[in-house]
Amino acid sequence: MRKIGTLGLVTGLTMGAVLGAMSLPTLAASERSAVLEEVVVTARKQEESAQDIPIAITALTQELENSSIRNLGDLNGYSPNLIFGSDGSRGGGGANINIRGISPTRSDDNSFDAPVAVVIDGIYLGTLAGQVLENFDLERVEILRGPQGTLFGKNTVGGVINVVRSRPTGEFGGKFKLTGGQDGQREARLVVNTAISDNVALKFFGTKIDYDGFMDNVTTGRGVAEKDYGNVGATILVDNDRFDALLTIEGFSDAGTLDAFHTNYNVGKDVLPKPPQGSAENDFSEGFTTCLAFGACRTSLATPGFSENDKDNVYDLETEAVTLNMTYELNENLTLASVTGVRKVNEYRLYDFDASAAPFITIERFNDYEQTSQELRLDGAFENLKFTAGLYYFNNEFEQDWITGDTFWGVLFGGLLRAPDIGAVLGVDALAGVPGLVACQIGVFAPVACDSALTMNDISGNITQILYETQDTTSVAAFFQGDYNLTDDLTLTAGLRWTREEKDFIAGQAYLSNEQRALARNFPGYADLSQEWTELSPKIGLTYQVNDNAIAFISYSEGFHSGGFFGVNQNIRDFERDQYDPEYAGNWEIGYKSQLLDNRMRLNVTYFRNDFEDKQESFVALDPDTKTVASVFDNAASVIYQGIELEVQYVFNEYLRGFLNYGRLDAEYDEFETDINPNDAATIIEDASFLNPRNAPDFTLGLGGTLSLPMGDGTLETFVKYTRIAEVDANLLNLKQSKIAERDDLAASIGYYAENWSLVAYGKNLTDERFEVFFPIATLFAAGSVNRPRTLGVELSYQF
């Protein structure tokens, strides 16, 4: 029934737009042009028309001027099978991007790479922090769906978000935007261009954003999702006849409160129903340890309108980045290109992991990240051959201290550590007279360890767990991809990328200490691990020129998502266990692209099938030794993702244009074995292929349009975008409480656009649809996160 309803909605809304357009006056084509503009992209490392290349791509240019696109997180609905989410647990522009059902298994730690890449001005961003880029001074955003391993390399099995910023113009001028909205939203954005000489241009840019949050924390008095963001930088362009260089130096500062773990989902007994007899579902009917111990239980499943965390979930992100793009025209057929990038990120996060008013468990993370990348390319264009060949180097290093505090460890182990005679407590004669703290220090409670420098006085307050990890990743690659015209109408595309990647990982054995010694790094032992992989990523395809305005293509490509070491662990044995290999994608695509009705209509259709092997999966299970929880990570599954994508753009007349993006996705496990109920203290591995792959909605729909009417010396423009996303299983084991129901989002703007200024009112989530996502940690505690409500704002822009 849902399929019929969705298709009916698409048809009804489309027909409504067509009938509405018929009532508008139509000027003759000679008086005013009403066609779709060509969009030039660099999705294949060279400038090409988006309609001429045989890949599934959505390129956004004019759309970025819409005030409802505040940042890349607002791109939902503009491309089929895209869910561009912000990772609230990261803050600082952390991203959680889903393309064709492929999304990060974990996104809270730099030890794990994302399967969808974000690239800005040719630089791959190796950390999820800072990927939700603010929308200002962006020339183009290209959404490449499906594996892009040949040209973009590792970690592109889902696709690539390729962002290109504007180049300096070489003329004095600029623009600024001032924005105000509800909940204390205040934004200012500025770009200024000038010339230094005839061939040297300079651009300055900056953004400042303040936001007071959309929900109150009734315990602390602060807001949820507060934001204090600043970005400043400069770009210099040297442009000679055959050589040009583009250098950007910039800095980011982003601080506030996290948009995650802000609702208390620690329900008491019988609030959540007991699973049916014999069911493998998790049983939360007895309630959660946190609320039962502290009397802070939630009594209703109604979506709350407030937060009650005893500590604010705060973050602070500082980023410095340098990007250098250079090209040199060797002759009329060959161009040499170089792309160099250096990026440093300092990240701090603290979150009240139990999300309640009780001081149960807090996690604090200090992370330093650096990356360096270098690409050298030779781009060629001859009569029947066009190609790109290159070498690539990438290195990143990160170091992270993280601390688990509050009363959690005291509740679990405080009594044992403070015991004057652990032998009497445990009934072990050999330990008679040994204090509990000493027993922990000599390894009696292994794998639980204690700081050798602790004294009994040190553990009179809260006990803190200390963890540490560092990783060095080096990746080198050589690649080639070319198009050869077999005939006037048939083109062969072939490419291959060779990649060698090495990861060196060190992590400390977690131990218990106190807050004063949180960064002492007095670890009783280390996991010192290394892995190296060599991979090939091929691509082959055929493109047929149907006519001057249409192409049909078929292609097969492969990609891989890096292996590694799962850093969110406590014990050396877990780090050694949770080494995982790359996961592999083999993707078939059959597509058709066309420009119809004298360039008034663009119709693109793609069928894809992406076979995932050795898929990386993670779940949380009880540790029988520590009586706490541990993350288990492995190559545990094979999944088939297949579907159809439809993209339509249509210019009804000089006043009205619309778009329709529809993605259908069928995702199912081919093989999957896991412990279906990891909370029962018994590890039973069984067939789990009947589960739905997480974060794989059956469909996505985006439908909208722009109506522009002359008014005085300017234009009155109205924009509307409707987005629908099917139900999603957000949890690996398909917990009922973690399902996100089918949801709608309506965004709109109306504004007056004069020659050099505009005034626009905009809104997002205008239907004020709310939902809550459930994050249980076994039966110890559970946090929730609620999406943002209706958002309204006004924006003034001026160009000079």
PLM ranges: what are they?
Residues 237-239, 378, 390-394, 469-610, ...:
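Structural signature of Gram-negative outer-membrane beta-barrels, strongest in the C-terminal barrel
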Residues 407, 411, 655-658, 723-732, ...:
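C-terminal beta-signal and adjacent terminal beta-strands/loops
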